[in-house]
Amino acid sequence: MPVEINGLLNHNISSETHPVPFETFDPEGIARMAKLHDAWGYDKVLVANAAIMPDNFTIAGYVAANTTRLGVMLAHRPGFIPPTMAARMLATLDRLMPGRVGVHIITAASDEETQADGDYQTKVERYDRAKEYISVLRRMWTDKKPFDHEGKWFRFNGGFAAIKPTQGTVPVYFGGMSPAALEVAGEYCDTFATLSDTVAGMTEVVGKVRDAAAPYGRSPRFLMSIRIVIADTEEAAWAQADEIREAVAANMGKLAPNTAAVKADGFKRTAELAARGDRLEKCFWNGINQLRGGQSNSGTLVGTPAQLADALMDYYDAGVSAFILRGFDPVEDVIAIGRDLIPLLRAKVAERDAQLAATEPAMA
């Protein structure tokens, strides 16, 4: 399966090593970063969503206006916008950037944060609502006539989208490690998205999600978000990692705590992973996870382009065929990953797929 390689697009150019105030909204920076990801071979960028963040639908449209081949993975919370309207919004965006839109359905880990937008459902209720929401989205994208719906969470008559996605649907990404999340993922998601982990950890995650999907006859794809430290030599890469740790430590007072992380099952895994040591497996580095107490999705692969490609192939062999790859320098690392790692990883995946195809029995 071809590998999907994505980046992350913020509403300003910042990171733990280059912090700017969260309130800074930088349209020129958004356009610059979108164009960089577009030029350096990324498939999509994740455009995040939270109660205090700028509207990401508007940002996604701005990305579309400033790129030619880049797609977006749009984080979206069910319930704030009715699914009928959201389906039309996503289909419209997908027609503006033909076939390059994915929607990452997120339910939020923190009740307090969702209450800031007037949503007082519990986490379990939000997962239950997500099931119905995704079902309505897909009917809106595929049904050729208006339809009525009366469910637990949504009710409408004559729902219809005259505009349809370019490829008939919009891929649905979903994540979460709680039992309720795995239940939704198994039945509904096209791609299961998760935080950084070791190969052994991801093998466990893949197994759990596949078990949840099996009763529905489904086989979702898997995406992992992981940080990258890349250099010409192994020694230089680890020296750079040490410099990053020092820079983040110096900036800790400028970084907002991720209070929602303490309630998220995925971040609990991150904290447990951080407690296991500084370096794990081939080149997995916990330095920033440890520094931030497991509240940051900052598991990192450190090494040369060849070492990093080999490490990512271990994940590919474990079932992960999509990644969000990002470094710590918000500009230079986008370029370095796109120039030195992405072509190498795509070539290795193509070679592996060709080898597998050659060993499969010929069709009768």
Tell where the protein language model's regions lie, with residue ranges:
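Alpha-helix-loop-beta-strand connector modules within alpha/beta enzyme cores
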Residues: 56-74, 129-133, 215-216, 339-353
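Hydrophobic faces of well-ordered beta-strands that scaffold small-molecule active sites
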Residues: 3-9, 45-47, 71-76, 101-105, ...
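N-terminal beta1-alpha1-beta2 module of alpha/beta enzyme domains
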Residues: 1-67, 167-170
